[in-house]
Amino acid sequence: MFERIISFAIQQRWLVLLAVFGMAGLGIFSYNRLPIDAVPDITNVQVQVNTSAPGYSPLETEQRATYPIEVVMAGLPGLEQTRSLSRYGLSQVTVIFKDGTDVYFARQLVNQRIQEAKDNLPEGVVPAMGPISTGLGEIYLWTVEAEEGARKADGTAYTPTDLREIQDWVVRPQLRNVPGVTEINTIGGFNKQYLVAPSLERLASYGLTLTDVVNALNKNNDNVGAGYIERRGEQYLVRAPGQVASEDDIRNIIVGTAQGQPIRIRDIGDVEIGKELRTGAATENGKEVVLGTVFMLIGENSRAVSKAVDEKVASINRTMPEGVKIVTVYDRTRLVDKAIATVKKNLLEGAVLVIVILFLFLGNIRAALITATIIPLAMLFTFTGMVNYKISANLMSLGALDFGIIIDGAVVIVENCVRRLAHAQEHHGRPLTRSERFHEVFAAAKEARRPLIFGQLIIMIVYLPIFALTGVEGKMFHPMAFTVVLALLGAMILSVTFVPAAVALFIGERVAEKENRLMLWAKRRYEPLLEKSLANTAVVLTFAAVSIVLCVAIAARLGSEFIPNLNEGDIAIQALRIPGTSLSQSVEMQKTIETTLKAKFPEIERVFARTGTAEIASDLMPPNISDGYIMLKPEKDWPEPKKTHAELLSAIQEEAGKIPGNNYEFSQPIQLRFNELISGVRSDVAVKIFGDDNNVLSETAKKVSAVLQGIPGAQEVKVEQTTGLPMLTVKIDREKAARYGLNMSDVQDAVATGVGGRDSGTFFQGDRRFDIVVRLPEAVRGEVEALRRLPIPLPKGVDARTTFIPLSEVATLEMAPGPNQISRENGKRRIVISANVRGRDIGSFVPEAEAAIQSQVKIPAGYWMTWGGTFEQLQSATTRLQVVVPVALLLVFVLLFAMFNNIKDGLLVFTGIPFALTGGILALWIRGIPMSITAAVGFIALCGVAVLNGLVMLSFIRSLREEGHSLDSAVRVGALTRLRPVLMTALVASLGFVPMAIATGTGAEVQRPLATVVIGGILSSTALTLLVLPVLYRLAHRKDEDAEDTREPVTQTHQPDQGRQPA
């Protein structure tokens, strides 16, 4: 089949070139559509169910809202896990499905179960699904701010309520229409409300209740349609508008009568534009702001959506009221562009180094250009495949591309073509005719097809273990393996079509094969080393064995981690205060943090934070926690450009630690989301304790936390805050209430309306709409003594008059701490102890911590402990790779056996793998890089290249033996003759990774372990292949040589017709 393809490519060379140009055009088109991101989206298929339960304590929220929803979700097709969180007035259930489940199908299933759950939920408690977004969907954040001295049309200054109104009714509707945006979340400022604040004394004097006020507002704020009438041939619609249109309309609503006189709302209280009882706030650089967040639709490209949002924001800014502006505070595009710039720089520099090596070794400019052309063509082919399979270009997907490996097949054919054309021209003593040239090109490509196919297949097979990874690790590394295989496949297709056609067209007259000075120098140095190796077999083999043993010992001492942390350039800081800290107090404390850090560190561009829970409760946080972001200036603008990111982080931690009342957890914006998606917590390591009793869980967690704090490397150890929320409990005495003829709900309604407020209609203002709320004045609802005097209406007597008793007659008010939050996982309560690991690897930290906990903490019967975080993924990936990698290596050996039809020679080539691993391990150890899945991918790639090194040399030695050379002659001549392709293989593969190994840009730390392993491994593999493999081959075949007749030694350098093996 390949012969027919090669023949067609040469005969129809212009057609082939035209097809290649077409493929390149499609690749360019695909490149412009290629999704670009910093890292792969590892979000599992999950659906959030958020339920608002106003006034419910965490325990009641769990009992009345969370549990019924969890129960109905059990048994869903493809269900993998449920996680839930119950806080004051809010419930969140996260339903996680198996990978591959369609997210829209999952949402449909969840929605069906929500309908079933509604029957078991209290009145007014309505669950709703979260946005169709991913855990990394928060791609763009902005603030709505008023400039200093800005005034509204009436001359008054802008208030937080005004800015929130602009955000909700001007900015948000426009941004929601941007393609790729699924939801806009808002936090900060106050939702505008029309507040009716009755006076208790006036209500009682008129014999009215809070319920009377609510009913009056509901009855006097509606429009009614009455069909139509026909009159004189025309049809008139009949309507009776009754909506309130101003504050005066509300004030004039009649609540009741007294002595024949109407009693209006203005007679019993005040009507004003009030503030909601908010659950969250936002701050920036020490002042309160309104903060908006874009949630990206799942499957969209973050860079494209961010750019579209940014353009829309610029458009909206031009239409904002004078003095009010939108300020972008976080844009994912900034990180994406920096990360992709690092990838581009590494790939371009690697390509340049590879091309230089080609020019130096091939000695023919046209041949080198044809070979180098494979690099952009293979990349364009890869881009087309990535677009079709919806793989984004990111640090991981492009992180393992090595152009030296990719062009190996093209080098096989081009070098063989050049050699055959040169020999044919030398034989004829004249330039070749076109038909002779085509014949030689066909023969050269035909000879090279076997090593080409086997070489490419071996490298593809060593990437198979990566496809066996599942879960988070699979989503991280599948794109990497897929792009490498795509690039290899594209290069292989081009090698048997474009390369023969291009060689036939552009390489013809005066072709000469000559060795350059570099190769002559290399041969002069290599020959005496080879002779010494062959003369000292025992020493060479002992040295090789000792090297392998030493590196195995070093490998055992290497630390381990899942993947290196990407330096995003910005810092995430979570400030935690004691449970029960009010929202207003928390905001003031957060302002102090922001102003202190901004003033102390000129490297900081801005600090902003979300305190509490936003309007869309995708991330439930109590008011005592602030989720902050420290946005840094570009390093070139730092006063001390030599200061490292780690040094700055350490200084910020130290300075923040001086501010009293706060505990901190430091991370990075994307990193904390990664951790949260992986294990449901934001830290690197999480210890989860499961059980039934909250008090037992809390006590056990404190003991575990104390142990963790003593483990070296543990930082920011904290226990999930499950207790300590101050509660004011109104304990109703049933007997006393019954004596007054009161139901429990009569007392509860009075308390709920007076303190919490009750929605009593909507105020329409054009497209805008605002709640009308009945609630007691702040001076009353904030005082415990005033609440004890809250009038409770008694059932009407014979005279139909309403009488009242104070709340204290039927209830007592008690202040005591209660549960702060209740977390559950798979239907069981749990508490989390979280920690970040710094200064050491996670792989060694967890076993040490686990042993310490087992020896020092006794877990009560019926309770159990598990570990979560990135360590869990490291274990999972390691376990799977330990099974799959040997299988892949076995397949490689099967291919080698098929190539040689000889187990002995297959095993000899296979020895290149341990030789390569020694260099990779040594390189990691020298650079102080722990073992990670990224480094493991490097070792996997290394196995393929190392096998090719041996294949290059051994195939040629075998061909010399078949032609009659003695064993010693074949080994010497073969090793010296194959020095060039072995060095080319090593240099192009290793130099292609050099830019990744030494890069310092954004994302370089993710690629560095892989590049370090490949470079170190190729250097050791090449050295050992050139010196050890000839010794091993002679040793393995000495008995065969003794059994054969002695042949005449061949002294001249042999130039066989067989094509060069893979380079």
UniProtKB/Swiss-Prot annotation:
Q: Name a GO molecular-function annotation.
A: xenobiotic transmembrane transporter activity
For bias kind Polar residues, which ranges apply?
Answer: 1049-1063
Compartmental location: Cell inner membrane
Q: Which Gene3D superfamilies match?
A: Multidrug efflux transporter AcrB pore domain, Multidrug efflux transporter AcrB pore domain like, Multidrug efflux transporter AcrB TolC docking domain, DN and DC subdomains, Multidrug efflux transporter AcrB transmembrane domain
Which biotechnological applications are listed for this entry?
In the presence of 2 mM Cd(2+) or 4-10 mM Zn(2+) up to 99% of the metal is removed from the culture supernatant and is sequestered via bioprecipitation. Additionally Cu(2+), Co(2+), Ni(2+), Pb(2+), Y(3+) and Ge(4+) can also be removed from culture supernatants, although it is not clear which efflux system is responsible for all these substrates.
Q: Quote the InterPro entries the UniProt record gives.
A: AcrB_DN_DC_subdom, Acrflvin-R, CusA-like
Query: Per its record, what triggers expression of this gene product?
Result: By zinc, cadmium and cobalt (zinc being the best and cobalt being the worst inducer).
A single Pfam family it belongs to is ACR_tran
Q: Where are the transmembrane segments?
A: 14-34, 350-370, 371-391, 395-415, 452-472, 487-507, 534-554, 883-903, 906-926, 937-957, 981-1001, 1013-1033
Q: Name one GO biological process term.
A: response to cadmium ion
**Keywords from the UniProt entry:** Cadmium resistance, Cell inner membrane, Cell membrane, Cobalt, Membrane, Plasmid, Transmembrane, Transmembrane helix, Transport, Zinc
Membrane topology type, per the record?
Multi-pass membrane protein
Question: GO CC: one term?
Answer: plasma membrane
Q: Where is this region: Disordered?
A: 1040-1063
- Sequence similarity: Belongs to the resistance-nodulation-cell division (RND) (TC 2.A.6) family.
Quote the function comment for this protein. Has a low cation transport activity for cobalt, it is essential for the expression of cobalt, zinc, and cadmium resistance. CzcA and CzcB together would act in zinc efflux nearly as effectively as the complete CZC efflux system (CzcABC).
Q: What is this protein called?
A: Cobalt-zinc-cadmium resistance protein CzcA
Species name for this entry?
Cupriavidus metallidurans (strain ATCC 43123 / DSM 2839 / NBRC 102507 / CH34) (Ralstonia metallidurans)
Record gene name: czcA
